[in-house]
Amino acid sequence: MTKQNAFTREDLLRCSRGELFGPGNAQLPAPNMLMVDRITHISEEGGKYGKGELVAELDITPDLWFFACHFEGDPVMPGCLGLDAMWQLVGFFLGWQGLPGRGRALGSGEVKFFGQVLPTAKKVTYNIHIKRVLKGKLNMAIADGSVSVDGREIYTAEGLRVGVFTSTDNF
């Protein structure tokens, strides 16, 4: 059976409700924290490291919730939301691979911000390159990612780490 390699907004909303990978498994956050409108490509191969990749998009409109509060008179998408979106996508990759448990961001290496998302932008694109997937007692992925706005790269993150846990009691 071939795995689905692209996901619509409705698919991602199903994932946020726990309906895509099954109860107790990886979920995306619900809106407003869901920072992705679609995954245009997901693969177990390819990417910079040949271990998998994801490409996803977020449509930008001036009425997005964060522009009203960050900052008044100087609206800009918080950089941490772009970083969170990359963690969301690494966790989605683990669920898509069939690894059981709830996703948790575990950290990252170097993060760089060298641009911004303004209300005049049209589209944010996320590119995730899987470096390694650990399967066993700990199921975890390590990836590098980037965020682009209207075709221009504005953030990068190295060593994004996300794990999935069948119990988060001691997390």
Swiss-Prot record:
Pathway: Lipid metabolism; fatty acid biosynthesis. PANTHER family: 3-HYDROXYACYL-[ACYL-CARRIER-PROTEIN] DEHYDRATASE (PTHR30272), 3-HYDROXYDECANOYL-[ACYL-CARRIER-PROTEIN] DEHYDRATASE (PTHR30272:SF8). Its main location: cytoplasm. Belongs to the thioester dehydratase family. FabA subfamily. It is found in: Cytoplasm. This is 3-hydroxydecanoyl-[acyl-carrier-protein] dehydratase. It holds the Pfam family FabA. GO terms for cellular component: cytoplasm. The keyword Chaperone does not apply. Necessary for the introduction of cis unsaturation into fatty acids. Catalyzes the dehydration of (3R)-3-hydroxydecanoyl-ACP to E-(2)-decenoyl-ACP and then its isomerization to Z-(3)-decenoyl-ACP. Can catalyze the dehydratase reaction for beta-hydroxyacyl-ACPs with saturated chain lengths up to 16:0, being most active on intermediate chain length. Its EC number is 4.2.1.59, 5.3.3.14. Homodimer. It catalyses: a (3R)-hydroxyacyl-[ACP] = a (2E)-enoyl-[ACP] + H2O; (3R)-hydroxydecanoyl-[ACP] = (2E)-decenoyl-[ACP] + H2O; (2E)-decenoyl-[ACP] = (3Z)-decenoyl-[ACP]. Gene3D superfamilies: Hotdog Thioesterase. The keyword Lipid metabolism applies. The active site is at 70. InterPro entries: FabA, FabA_FabZ, HotDog_dom_sf. One of its GO terms (biological process) is unsaturated fatty acid biosynthetic process. Keywords: Cytoplasm, Fatty acid biosynthesis, Fatty acid metabolism, Isomerase, Lipid biosynthesis, Lipid metabolism, Lyase.
